């Protein structure tokens, strides 16, 4: 194989790796968004419950026991 052929193969490998990395990154964005939404909802629920004394006493695992 000549130098041009080796260089061309190198560029093709780099391009293939870039395309695979780029598409897999976009696929994970949806999972990250779903996880962030779930965490936000749980934090809102925790804040609502912990401000309400009856809910706080019913859910000690949800609220900080030291506060």
From Swiss-Prot:
Propeptide feature: residues: 22-46
GO CC, one annotated term: host cell postsynaptic membrane
Major site of localization recorded for this protein: secreted
Region (Lacks the Ser-Xaa-Pro motif that is crucial for potent interaction with nAChR): 51-53
Protein name: Alpha-conotoxin-like Qc1.1b
Keywords assigned: Acetylcholine receptor inhibiting toxin, Disulfide bond, Ion channel impairing toxin, Neurotoxin, Postsynaptic neurotoxin, Secreted, Signal, Toxin
UniProt source species: Conus quercinus
Domain notes per entry: The cysteine framework is I (CC-C-C). Alpha4/7 pattern.
Gene Ontology molecular function, alphabetical: acetylcholine receptor inhibitor activity; ion channel regulator activity; toxin activity
């Amino acid at each position: 194989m000549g130098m041009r052929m080796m260089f061309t193969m190198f560029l093709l490998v780099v391009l293939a790796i870039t395309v695979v990395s780029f598409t897999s990154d976009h696929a994970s964005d949806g999972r990250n968004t779903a996880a962030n939404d779930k965490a936000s909802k749980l934090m809102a629920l925790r804040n609502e419950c912990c401000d309400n004394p009856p809910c706080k006493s019913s859910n000690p695992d949800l609220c900080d026991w030291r506060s």
